[in-house]
């Protein structure tokens, strides 16, 4: 796992086609682990998302899945964007496109539908590196327009992923649902 120097290990990202590679995958969150072991493959089979595995050498150390999404921003959230009161600052919108951008009622996005790091590989900056890889994937994809990356960050008593995503420049896209298990976050791509 560690080569004795400060060079982070190479992360190899590929489409996940062999779900048996996940047979011993555990991220340490029981609900997510159960989902990965029993229902993740069904989500993929029913075209909900495209799965990716992340390897260091020959070991799956993380997985994520992506699907298309849209960001609907209420006016007060647009005001926050205009003022730069988000984790990612003011969007890089040209002056000629500004009126068009702010008049939209929804914006194209790619959602991180699932994201998990193998328990023994957590706290090694792999998650942050993967978020940046996902941002680059979203920027490079050429199937449709994409201005944001979104995620429903898992949050329950005793565990919340919101802090991790905020460190990765995500901001709240909606107020938290007091009875829900997730909080919707977004990050501007440009």
Which role does the model predict for each range below?
Residues 144-146, 151-175:
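Conserved active-site alpha-helix within GNAT-family acetyltransferase domains
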Residues 123-137, 167:
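Conserved acetyl-CoA-binding loop-helix of GNAT-fold acetyltransferases
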Residues 65-114:
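Conserved acyl-donor/pantetheine-binding loop and adjacent beta-alpha core of acyl/acetyltransferases
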Residues 49-53, 63, 109, 114, ...:
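Short hydrophobic/aromatic beta-strand element in the GNAT-like acyltransferase core
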Residues 131, 157-161, 175-185:
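Short glycine/proline-centered loop/turn elements that form peptide/ligand docking sites
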Residues 48-67, 73:
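Conserved beta-hairpin
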Residues 105, 118-129, 157:
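Conserved glycine-rich acetyl-CoA-binding loop
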